[in-house]
Amino acid sequence: MNPEANENSAFVAGPKWFPVDNDGIFQLADIDYVATYKAMEELLQTGKVRAIGVSNFSIRRLEHLLKQTEVVPAVNQVEAHPYLTQPDLLQYCQGKDIFIQAYSPLGNNQTGEPRTVDDPLVHQVAQRLGMDPGVVLGSWGVQRGTIVLPKSVTPSRIAGNLQVRELPEDAFAQLNSLERHKRYNFPSRWGHDIFDEVGEETAKKMGKEAGPENKTKFTV
């Protein structure tokens, strides 16, 4: 089997941001991400951009990319928080001088599940240190060598995000212990195994099962 089969999936071009068929199944196109990245490399030569990077790349996909391109990505933007530490990916990227940008550093509530920032242990650590729970998680992310990307539109929260500081070793270790490989952002409804975790056949099945909900949720 070709390990790169079904590797290059993207939404088909069209007027809709989220193209689904009559059954609610996402319509994917075969787009070569290596070719796309090479085009981004050419942009560097124009001076119009200063750096290029990738998002949601596994170690396997990074290795495939690096073998065929010249410029090492400046960043790999992935979901990361104490519930999803991805230590192997972090170590690999650090060894290649690729920064990890952590999105959803507090977890999110898109699925209605409790967020990482709401974990009782996070609040215990925050109370003991006299810190906001969100700032605690931001501090944890910076301390482990990642670029943390918290989202906020509130001026006070934006200012608070700048109050990160080094955590005591025991507090840092406590937060590390929360690891459970929990993803809040898992696009299984797309029908593509983007994270190399469930297999393409399972991902396609999950995409079909999500079809009825997709038809009502993704209308633009």
Question: Which residues are covered by each model-predicted region?
Answer:
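Beta/alpha (TIM)-barrel catalytic core signal, keyed to glycine-rich beta->alpha loops juxtaposed to Asp/Glu
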Residues: 2-220
